[in-house]
């Protein structure tokens, strides 16, 4: 097992205190799950699993869900936890692309599903893998990414209907875009990564900068964007499909639309995995099995109250079992992901290379400097056409694509050492980790100062 080594993380480690679940009732088994999923998803899966587990084993199980925030924060929390040597979490459930990074860091315990369960899961959907070839993770659900928009606001203001990601960069949408913080939300980070790859790094980064400049505000949670759109606070924003669908079924949802930019988006599977050192490994494996069986997969797609479906909440997600998309399945999918062509433009290796650094770069460039960026963009817009000179200065990235990948490897990858390292080896690893963290902090400070000066030149 690999452990992260590093100092200067006391605050993060202290945040772990009290994160474990309560003591289980006498005779009950326990399961501790880290998940960025909503309360509705947690409640439905917990209740259904408890029923299934009781039938399978004759035993009760108590499930606890420590609050870990979004998937980006969940990954950081796990890094801190393994650094401290605390193996007190059993399962990671949800979070998207962070599972490949967790596998590389040695956080995941391989678990091969029973043959009948594994045989029902395709290896890919639209070219994207649905499970790890070494069985370290399984895609528990499928998602797509697009734009949620308020039809009434767009009509009242005479705005162009959004069809591609570039709509968020249009000056006509100044102050009407809702954006998310990629350092806090993995689905927001994924949406921004899709934009970078769909248009190419330079143009994609320009779209992200102009989107941020148009933003009314940055939301901490990806689910805040569709809620703000339904309230009429924003006109458009990036959104994962099931957040959009659930909001459209809620109050104010009749005014909402959702579009997946044609040829400019990609499917994403939302994995589940057993964590290394899981104290309740047998129960953890049963939970993964349940989620991947039809009994778990139906919860995503059946309406509340339907036999085998959720009890109270419509989860509105796409299952990974093709059998649930048939005419006799009783489900109501918005689309069939197994009928979509592969997204040939998407390179998972590029995503992985900047998985850690991209959220921090965008946080510094767009979120923490949002006000000077917004004022600079407003000044450019007021000057009228042509916008190109001011825009070029505004959107030019500080890092090339190659530089970002290199820094991602050299500075944004935590120092790791194998268990059993000698005291001298541990001390050396700690020294390197401290140096890495100092360099990371220095780079972020330099980026912030450079970009702030650049933005201020324009207003």
Predicted feature locations:
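Ligand-binding "clamshell"
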Residues: 102-111, 133, 247-260
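A structural signal for short loop-to-beta-strand junctions that line the ligand-binding cleft
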Residues: 83, 87-91, 109-151, 166, ...
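Periplasmic-binding protein-like
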Residues: 120-121, 207-212, 252-278, 322-325
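Ligand-binding pocket segment of bilobal, Venus flytrap-like solute-binding proteins
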Residues: 194-258, 298
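Mature extracytoplasmic/periplasmic domains
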Residues: 275, 280-284, 288-346
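A bilobed periplasmic-binding-protein/Venus flytrap-type ligand-binding module shared by bacterial periplasmic
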Residues: 148-153, 267-281, 299-300
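Early extracytoplasmic/lumenal segment of secretory-pathway proteins
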Residues: 22-101, 226
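C-terminal non-catalytic accessory extensions
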Residues: 376, 380-459
């Amino acid at each position: 097992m690999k452990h992260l080594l590093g100092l200067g993380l006391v605050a993060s480690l202290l945040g772990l205190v009290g994160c474990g679940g309560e003591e289980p009732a006498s005779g009950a088994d326990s399961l501790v799950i880290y998940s960025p999923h909503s309360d509705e998803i947690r409640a439905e899966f917990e209740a259904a699993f408890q029923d299934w587990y009781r039938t399978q084993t004759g035993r009760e199980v108590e499930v606890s869900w420590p609050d870990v925030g979004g998937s980006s924060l969940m990954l950081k929390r796990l890094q801190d936890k393994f650094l401290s040597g605390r193996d007190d979490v059993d399962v990671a459930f949800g979070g998207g692309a962070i599972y490949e990074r967790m596998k590389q860091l040695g956080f995941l315990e391989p678990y091969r599903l029973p043959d009948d369960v594994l045989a029902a899961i395709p290896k890919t959907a639209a070219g994207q893998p649905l499970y790890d070839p070494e069985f370290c993770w399984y895609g528990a659900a499928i998602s797509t990414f697009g734009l949620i928009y308020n039809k009434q606001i767009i009509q009242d203001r005479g705005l162009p209907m959004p069809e591609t990601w570039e709509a968020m960069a249009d000056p006509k949408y100044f102050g009407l875009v809702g954006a998310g913080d990629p350092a806090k939300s993995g689905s927001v980070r994924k949406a921004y990564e899709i934009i970078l790859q769909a248009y190419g790094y330079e143009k994609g980064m320009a779209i992200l900068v102009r989107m941020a400049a148009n933003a009314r505000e940055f939301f901490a949670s990806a689910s805040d964007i569709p809620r703000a759109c339904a309230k009429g606070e924003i006109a458009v924003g990036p959104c994962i499909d099931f957040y959009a669908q659930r909001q459209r079924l809620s109050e104010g949802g009749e005014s909402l639309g959702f579009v997946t930019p044609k040829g400019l988006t990609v499917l994403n599977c939302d994995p589940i995995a057993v964590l290394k050192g899981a104290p309740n490994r047998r129960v953890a494996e049963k939970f993964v099995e349940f989620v991947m069986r039809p009994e778990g997969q139906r919860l995503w797609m059946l309406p509340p109250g339907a036999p085998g479906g959720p009890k109270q909440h419509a989860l509105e997600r796409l299952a990974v079992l093709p059998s649930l998309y048939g005419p006799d399945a009783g489900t109501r999918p918005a689309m069939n992901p197994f009928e979509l062509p592969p997204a040939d433009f998407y390179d998972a290796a590029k995503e992985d290379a900047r998985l850690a650094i991209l959220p921090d770069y965008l946080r510094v460039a767009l979120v923490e400097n949002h006000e000077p960026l917004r004022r600079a963009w407003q000044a450019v817009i007021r000057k009228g056409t042509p916008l190109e000179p001011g825009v070029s200065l505004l959107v030019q990235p500080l890092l090339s694509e190659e530089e970002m990948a290199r820094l991602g490897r050299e500075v944004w990858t935590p120092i790791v050492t194998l268990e059993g390292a000698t005291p001298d080896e541990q001390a050396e690893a700690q020294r390197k980790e401290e140096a890495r963290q100092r360099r990371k902090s220095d780079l972020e400070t330099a980026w912030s100062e450079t970009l702030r000066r650049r933005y201020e030149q324009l207003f």
